[in-house]
Amino acid sequence: MESTDSSGGPPPPQPNLPPGFRFHPTDEELVVHYLKRKAASAPLPVAIIAEVDLYKFDPWELPAKASFGEQEWYFFSPRDRKYPNGARPNRAATSGYWKATGTDKPVLASDGNQKVGVKKALVFYSGKPPKGVKSDWIMHEYRLIENKPNNRPPGCDFGNKKNSLRLDDWVLCRIYKKNNASRHVDNDKDHDMIDYIFRKIPPSLSMAAASTGLHQHHHNVSRSMNFFPGKFSGGGYGIFSDGGNTSIYDGGGMINNIGTDSVDHDNNADVVGLNHASSSGPMMMANLKRTLPVPYWPVADEEQDASPSKRFHGVGGGGGDCSNMSSSMMEETPPLMQQQGGVLGDGLFRTTSYQLPGLNWYSS
């Protein structure tokens, strides 16, 4: 009986390969150019695959038996029957056994239409079944497709093989060990890539993403603009929110959509960027410089006398009656609407309190 000691016997001859040679064949190449030629006793492209009876060794002994390889090793191996009259292969090894995982996968030719072989994945278990301990050693076993009786040539007799323990003269096996460390390295690379992507995101978008968790209940509400028409006394401009974005309007239309804390710069006026309440950082300050020629919202004549509850705050100079407007609006809003939000006019009334310098939302 052949010794199971990997140190016994001379090492297999090393193939004469050019520098930089790598052996990474596809499944089709392994079956067509190596296994099929080996079964037909035809010359191989290169003598790089050793002939070893894998089931007489434990998997950690096999790298020393290989002709070539560093992380994975290839072998031609015979396959025996488990029982003389059965078709099941014998998977027992020296100190354990190989267990198949999943179903056989067909190996197709490059055109994708012809089946040239079968691939089976196996895992090595130490001990005796069924209480074996699963290891990290993996085997991919390639075998040729079986010849159907109607495809066998006339006069071909396999009677001598029926009573033999030999199931296949040759199968081709790839052996490797799963490396948990490499998987951790791959995960670290994924995390590094995610961090790199987030570092490339502008701070305004990052802050917006961080604050979305505080406003998940608004996601089922229409994303249309929450527009509150009204008129302000004195020079200034209007601010409103549409759920995730804060926009500034002048008399002609939108000047800036500042999201949660973005910044825009143009000409002449200062404005405070709004930031949703969160623990991610202090309030962001933004400067908006632009000449605002019209101090009022564009409203129709019939809306000039609209009730204070349908007006919104202006921010800027001369806002003498802004606090009165805020007080009136809060007084006329039902308590439930003040707590949870409700429909006011055509939009959603948001009661989120923003700390704006010089402006008291709840002053009477």
Swiss-Prot record:
Residues 116-184 bind DNA. One of its GO terms (cellular component) is nucleus. It comes from Arabidopsis thaliana (Mouse-ear cress). Its main location: nucleus. One of its GO terms (biological process) is seed morphogenesis. Transcription factor of the NAC family. Together with NAC018/NARS2, regulates embryogenesis by regulating the development and degeneration of ovule integuments, a process required for intertissue communication between the embryo and the maternal integument. Disruption phenotype: When associated with disruption in NAC018/NARS2, abnormally shaped seeds, defect in embryogenesis sometimes arrested at the torpedo-shaped embryo stage thus leading to partial embryonic lethality, markedly delayed integuments degeneration, and delay of silique senescence. Keywords: DNA-binding, Nucleus, Transcription, Transcription regulation. This is NAC transcription factor 56. Residues 9-18 have a biased composition (Pro residues). Residues 1-23 are annotated as: Disordered. The lineage of its organism: Eukaryota, Viridiplantae, Streptophyta, Embryophyta, Tracheophyta. The NAC domain includes a DNA binding domain and a dimerization domain.
